[in-house]
Amino acid sequence: MPDKPYRIQTPSGHRKYLCSGLYLPSVTTVLSATESSKSKAGLRQWQERNPGALQAAAARGTAIHKCCEDFLRGIEVSCPDEYRPFWNGMDQYLEWFDELHWSERPLRSDWNHLRSEDKEVAFVWSTEHKYAGCPDLVGEIGGVKVIADFKTSTGPYTNTFPERGDRIGYGGFRKYQKCAQQMAAYRLALGERVGFRCDVALIIVSTEETTQGIFIDGDQLDLYEQRFIKRCQMFHENEDNNETEDCSQQELPEQNEPAKVC
């Protein structure tokens, strides 16, 4: 039986995972750290212009993730009024799933080794490419294996490169590409850990006005997987060339690309 995974906070506040004896960065850490200097500067400027917006978005995302998880587990959904516009419409996409294997944590006993010691959290990880993370949903729709991710946003996502000058479209395209790489990374790690290879990915995006379901087929996921692997290599090369935190003494807890848009 593989070692139980653990989630660890480093002295600087970053999140790492101890899996199979390796201290691994999260998928989102890899993606954020390997953004271009221009993108990082743009995010800093946006945060300066919109104080508190990042924290508000995180709180909104946490609330909607809780609604999705409760719905999938057959628990009555109690959505705070301020987030209800973001929840409305998400359930119609969740109802497509006729078989569930993972909802934040494994729903099948043969995947329980992916749970932490206290069973409160669970992760998938790649020992080959050295990263870890937690998918939102893995299941099946009509026998098709699907990995899904829940997103809330102030604007819609788009899977096609926008016209020149379309700043909103460009933002939606960048978010789509980042999420596609994130799900490709989870898909790869899940296959490495339990031999379950998802056929497609589904991004479920909610805004105050609408909800989108964007499918990404297997061929596109393969391309995004290669992009993520390159970013992993870049991340670890940079980590090797810089002074890194020693996590070993930390106390362990007890615990322009088309896709179908629906």
Predicted regions and their residues:
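Glycine- and charge-rich intrinsically disordered segments
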Residues: 1-2, 238-262
